[in-house]
Structure formats: structure tokens, C-alpha cells
């Protein structure tokens, strides 16, 4: 904690501050004759022109904040903060409102967990903007950039930020009732004792704004011995800005989104069914797949948007087989004679499917390998024979290559080959276990899922800390575009938007309340 601000400055020093037109307000103290209720102290974080303040009304348990500051964003923050030092698992909940609709539409009122009072501190917050936009913001390293996951709920009545172990998540309520999980479950490294509180930034250094926080609840949650409650969140991430947008969250397990060819809806699987829902959000609708009622997470639309490839386990001793159905639903048509078979890619001309299959189970050489088969029917062609697991085959948009992942070198890495299986070559060479390469519509980028090396190369489990990484096809230098709690079912199948600007994926969370 920084020292108290000196109230009376020498004239020369004061003149310097006035000339600069800015005040570094680090006044960490409670008001002289009032309580801050649940919190211990208040003050401005970062550089502000106009000092903020807080008034606490004990009779209504309401905090009225005034605050200035450029923003809570990028690499440094400037805002009014009211806090308490805590550690461990935390839940902070409040109703938040702005008294006026004027000012910057992106003024922010926040519920925050923060490592320190430095402007560039590690933090996570749930922020509601003046225009109603709501997001889980986070900076996971000191001096790093702020990132966010935008909620699909605008102007929620009640907001919550919660920390469980190393993870944080947001919960929101549109009207009366308790907030429900709305996405997040991010690993944010808060060490030891950290700051928990409420804050306000005007998003305009020359303006002072106001916000009200009522029905504030702050609890230190003891670890629960009960079974976790599992949630899945359908999200999209912009590959350029890495901003994330929540499409749908539910207290259930669903997986593996595809983008429709026209960009209007997303396809995913849940409880043996394949569903679709608008990209803008809404209620998922089941796609009729007839007798195929045990569909897994390997599915995707044809290039001409008339058919949907599915992988289903309802026949032949529940081994997976590949089928096609009309994109709007209908009777499945069987494509693969042999099982288990798991679809992964369409050829650009829509005439061939790439899939993963295991043959001669229990015998030598029964590894999962890459196969192709004509959509119109015919014999399958085996393309890989290397020892170990091969998975995730997907055609490049120009039809020149099939990209896939293979553990043949001892770790799971991305490979590619010609569509006849020739010229197999390794693409990634790093310490991660890399799965499910997906090529951008223009053929310039690869996105894939990376597990840390504490996971077996041949395994891709659920509920792990994983990275979604983006890599140019020509330079092969990858960067992280999303830190995700997920794994199996996150991006198993092609998930680029048709315009190549976003990736759809599923993240998971598990809470014990």
C-alpha cells in the first residue's frame, strides 16, 4: 500500500502539480466519521485529474461512488476504488446502477479482485458499462494488456464476481433472483492477500461520474466438499483483437461448435443431439437426426450448406459411424461401413470426407489413423500408418493439404500431408500437446488447441487449463488468443466464422456452492 497523501504541499511543489494539470491521488483512508460497511478503505488507483469519493448509507447498505479516470483497460487503470484485503475463495455481489445516462457510454462500474493498488496490477472484474455492456475483464500479468469476455446480457440488475481456487467467473441476473453463471472461469494469478472491492471509472479523465452499489454482499467462501456444478459456455473470440463474446451459457455439458456457412447460426452437440442457435444468442433448437440419437462431438456442415456430417454411436454396439443428414434435419445416410469412425473434415468440393478410424481393434497396429471416403459412397482410403494416435484431419481451403494432429514423435503436434497421404510433414515443434488444427477460410491461419505437458500426449480430457492458439501458415509462430478452462469439446471441429474474423468455442466451469 502506498503512503498517505500529504494534505499541505510546499508552494513550489503545488505549483508543479497545478501546472501539470494532474493529481496522483493515492489517498488510502476511510472517511473521518463514517464507516465503509463491508470494506476497509478507499482511494483512487492510477492517475486521475479529479479525486473520487464514496458515501456509505448504513440504513440502506448502499455505496454511492464518484470517480474519474481514463479507463480500466489496456496496461494501466485509473479509477475510484473501495476495498477490503482478503484471501482465498471470494464471492462479491451487488446491484449496480448509474443515476444518469449521460457521459461516456463506456464509463464502468465494477466488482473487482486486485493483487495490488498499482495501476498496472493483475486483476479481474465484472464491469457494467454506461451503455449496458457487461464483461469479465482481466489482466493476468503485471503490466500486461487487459482482456475481456463480453456477456450476452445487457444491463443486468445484479452482478457477481467469484473466485474459486485460481479461477474467477461472473454471474448475472437480469431481474429479480440470484445471479447465475454467465461465463468466465479464467485462471487469474492472485497471490496471498489481495484487494476485493467496488470501483468506478468515468472513461473520461476530465469528467466525474457517479454510480450506486446496493445490496452488496461479500463472503469468504469455505471450500465445499460437495460435487461440482458443471456449466458450459458457448463463446466466440475475435482473432485480431482477442475480445471474447458469450453467446450462450447453461448448467449442462455441450461441445464442439461449428459456424454455419452463411454465418447466421452455430451448431453444437448436447446429450446425443445436434443443435443450432443464432450467433446473436437465443434458445438452442434440436436438429432432427432421426435414429441417430447418440451423436458425439464430431460434426460439421458441407461446403454448399446442404448437408451436415455427423458421427453417431446409436448403432452396432455403440461404436461411432459417420453419416450425413440434410442441414435442416432428416434421415441419416450412412457413409462409413466400418467403426469406430469419427468425422472431421469436408473436402472443398464437398465430394470427400476426412475422418479418424480405428481398425482391427485389439490387434497389432490398431492405432487411430486418418482416412478419407467419398460422400457418394465407396471404399475408405487409409492415409496414415505411423505408430501412435492420429486425429483431427481437416482440408485446407484450396484442397492441397490435410492438416491433422499426431503423437508419432512422442508429443502431440500438428502435421500436414497431401490429400493422397504423401509428403507427411510436422508443422508445430513446441512443448505443448497440440490438437485439432482448423484452417482459416483464406488459408492463411491455423487455430488449434494446446494442452500443457502435464496431460498425456494421447489424451485430451475435459476441464483442463488449455490455450487456443493462432499461427500463420507461412511463419509457424503461434500466439495465444484465448485462455480457456476446457479441452475435449472446446474446438474439436471446424469453427471459423465464414469471414475469418472469429472462432467459436466452448469453455467450461465447475463450481461448488
Q: Model-found features: residue ranges?
A:
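Bacterial N-terminal signal peptides that target proteins for export
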Residues: 1-13
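Sequence-pattern detector for short linear motifs
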Residues: 5-8, 117, 142, 166, ...
Amino acid at each position: 500500500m502506498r503512503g498517505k497523501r500529504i494534505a499541505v504541499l510546499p508552494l513550489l511543489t503545488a505549483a508543479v502539480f497545478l501546472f501539470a494539470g494532474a493529481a496522483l491521488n493515492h489517498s488510502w483512508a476511510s472517511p473521518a466519521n463514517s464507516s465503509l460497511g463491508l470494506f476497509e478503505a478507499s482511494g483512487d488507483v492510477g492517475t486521475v485529474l479529479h479525486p473520487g469519493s464514496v458515501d456509505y448509507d448504513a440504513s440502506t447498505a448502499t455505496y454511492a461512488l464518484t470517480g474519474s479516470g481514463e479507463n480500466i483497460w489496456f496496461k494501466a487503470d485509473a479509477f475510484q476504488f473501495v476495498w477490503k484485503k482478503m484471501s482465498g475463495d471470494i464471492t462479491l455481489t451487488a446491484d449496480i446502477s448509474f443515476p444518469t445516462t449521460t457521459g461516456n457510454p463506456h464509463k464502468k462500474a465494477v466488482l473487482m479482485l486486485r493483487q495490488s493498488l498499482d495501476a498496472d496490477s493483475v486483476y479481474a472484474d465484472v464491469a457494467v458499462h454506461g451503455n449496458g455492456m457487461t464483461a469479465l475483464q482481466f489482466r493476468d500479468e503485471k503490466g500486461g494488456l487487459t482482456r475481456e469476455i463480453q456477456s450476452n446480457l445487457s444491463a443486468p440488475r445484479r452482478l457477481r464476481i467469484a473466485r474459486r481456487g485460481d479461477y474467477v467467473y461472473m454471474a448475472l441476473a437480469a431481474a429479480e433472483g440470484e445471479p447465475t453463471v454467465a461465463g468466465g472461469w479464467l485462471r487469474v494469478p492472485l497471490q496471498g492477500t489481495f484487494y476485493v472491492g467496488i470501483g468506478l471509472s468515468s472513461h473520461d479523465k476530465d469528467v466525474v461520474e457517479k454510480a450506486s452499489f446496493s445490496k452488496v454482499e461479500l463472503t469468504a467462501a469455505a471450500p465445499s466438499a460437495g460435487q461440482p456444478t458443471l456449466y458450459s459456455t458457448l463463446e466466440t473470440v475475435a482473432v485480431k483483437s482477442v475480445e471474447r463474446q458469450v453467446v450462450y451459457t447453461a448448467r449442462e455439458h455441450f461441445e464442439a461448435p461449428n459456424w454455419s456457412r452463411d454465418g447466421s447460426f452455430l451448431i453444437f452437440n448436447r446429450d446425443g443431439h445436434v443443435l443450432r442457435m443464432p450467433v446473436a444468442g437465443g434458445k438452442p433448437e434440436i436438429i432432427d437426426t432421426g435414429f441417430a440419437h447418440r451423436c458425439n462431438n464430431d460434426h460439421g456442415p458441407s461446403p454448399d450448406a446442404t448437408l451436415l456430417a455427423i458421427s453417431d454411436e446409436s448403432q452396432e454396439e455403440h461404436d461411432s459411424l459417420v453419416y450425413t443428414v440434410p442441414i435442416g434435419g432428416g434421415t441419416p445416410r450412412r457413409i462409413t461401413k466400418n467403426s469406430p469412425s469419427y468425422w472431421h473434415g469436408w473436402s472443398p468440393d464437398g465430394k470427400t470426407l476426412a475422418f479418424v478410424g480405428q481398425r482391427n481393434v485389439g490387434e497389432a497396429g490398431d492405432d487411430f489413423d486418418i482416412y478419407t471416403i467419398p460422400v457418394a459412397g465407396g471404399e475408405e482410403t487409409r492415409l496414415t500408418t505411423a505408430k501412435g494416435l492420429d486425429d483431427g484431419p481437416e482440408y485446407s481451403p484450396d484442397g492441397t493439404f490435410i492438416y491433422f494432429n499426431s503423437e508419432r514423435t512422442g508429443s502431440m503436434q500438428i502435421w500436414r500431408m497431401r490429400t493422397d497421404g504423401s509428403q507427411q510433414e510436422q508443422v508445430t515443434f513446441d512443448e505443448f500437446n497440440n490438437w485439432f488444427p482448423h484452417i482459416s477460410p483464406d488459408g492463411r491461419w491455423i487455430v488449434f488447441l494446446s494442452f500443457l505437458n502435464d496431460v498425456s500426449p494421447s489424451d485430451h480430457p475435459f476441464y483442463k487449463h488449455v490455450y487456443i492458439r493462432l499461427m500463420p501458415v507461412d511463419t509457424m509462430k503461434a500466439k495465444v488468443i484465448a485462455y480457456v478452462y476446457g479441452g475435449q469439446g472446446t474446438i474439436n471441429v471446424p469453427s471459423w466464422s465464414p469471414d475469418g474474423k472469429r472462432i467459436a468455442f466452448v469453455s467450461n466451469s465447475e463450481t461448488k456452492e
